[in-house]
Amino acid sequence: MRPERGYVLCDPCLGRLFGSGNILHCEKRGRIIRGKGRDRPSECHICKGLCPSLEESCGPSLWGAAAYEFETFVVGVRLKSSMAERDDEVRSRCRLAGAAALRAYVAAMLSSYLGAMTGASVDHGAPELSITADLRDNTAEFHPRPVVLSGRYTKSVRGLSQKGAPCGGCAGEGCTSCGMLGVDTGGSVEGVISGHACGTYSARRASFTWVGGEDQESLVGGRGRPFVAQLVQPHRRGLVHPATVRLGGVVLHGLREVRSMPQLPVRFRSKVRLAVSAKGEISDDTLGRLADLGGSTLAVYEGRRRVERAIHSASHSRTGPGSFELHMEVDGGVPFKRFVSGETVFPNLSDLLGTVCSCGGFDFEEITVERGGHPGARGGTRRRPRKGPARPAGGRDRPRKT
């Protein structure tokens, strides 16, 4: 029995079902199986003429890849259910369990086409661009892998909170007033960094992992506070950033792309300066008790949960009869205002000095991530990502970036 008896098959489907070898050579194998002197059918029982004209009919749907920069990609395929059912029927009836499926052939051919146009390679593990080609209406969906940025920031102005409030116009969904970011871009460190990073990478929005936090009125000095930002739907990647990026009162340091988000929790230490006021005057002897803080351990209570935080060093300087500055290096996660007032932190300044104390503010002089706990793994040297296939002259405009 000839392989195609009972079915009219095109060369690609014939070679795919009844040949073996590289899936990209199915059409050539189909011509060999069919034999010389035999005319090619005008229509195929399975694909209805799709496979012989795959590049012409489906290739244009991949032009949207031109809006992205990438070195690796993967193509998935959606077929008409009737087409997939006919393919399954033929493979079952002819007992071709090991033959390549139509979906796999189409994905391989489109991948070959896109790879030839861009020089990018297929990666089924963690591609920089995932494409779903929908052959039901010859469209395509593009899903770039998020870009993860690691860096530090210093803050030289007060009145700027760390985390941004959702945009009042869209409740965090994204609108024109917030640049589609979902947060107020000017009222917080998060908003300032989001605006810069998403603008640089043409990304949809950013989500952050912070190494500690500070009050709205706190300053952040030294080398800055580490952070990691994941950029969603980026159109660019593989960028090299300046050593410092000045964004008003916020300065970014050492911004770079890394492989992944950090393993939580991240262990770190903070050098902090606290402004403390007591209810009355404090004698020098009483202030001398602060020397006992260095090398001690704080017990911090959060509901029924007890957490210990070490104080590695402590020193003080008087600023008035009933006020002083306390300089400490402590483990991350100490609630400084509660440490001063005495609420659920033991020992605390109010108990230690025997008077009611309040914290007028605190600034960070340095934040150090403990060895092996840096947020994000450094990425290797990489080539500049290629863009998608160039759109032919006179083609449709690029999709608008959002």
Curated annotation (Swiss-Prot):
Q: Does the keyword Lipid biosynthesis apply?
A: no
Disordered: annotated span? 370-402
Which residue intervals are annotated with compositional bias (Basic residues) in the record? 380-389
Q: Which reaction does it catalyse?
A: uridine(54) in tRNA = pseudouridine(54) in tRNA; uridine(55) in tRNA = pseudouridine(55) in tRNA
Q: Which biological processes are named by the entry's GO terms?
A: tRNA pseudouridine synthesis
Q: Which UniProt keywords apply?
A: Isomerase, RNA-binding, tRNA processing
Q: What terms describe the molecular function in GO for this protein?
A: tRNA binding; tRNA pseudouridine(55) synthase activity
Has UniProt tagged this entry with the keyword tRNA processing? yes
Active site at D215
What EC number(s) are associated with this protein in UniProt?
5.4.99.25
The family database entries (Pfam families) matched by this protein are listed as:
Pus10_C, Pus10_THUMP_arc
What function is annotated for this protein? Responsible for synthesis of pseudouridine from uracil-54 and uracil-55 in the psi GC loop of transfer RNAs.
Its family remark reads: Belongs to the pseudouridine synthase Pus10 family.
What is this protein's record name? tRNA pseudouridine synthase Pus10
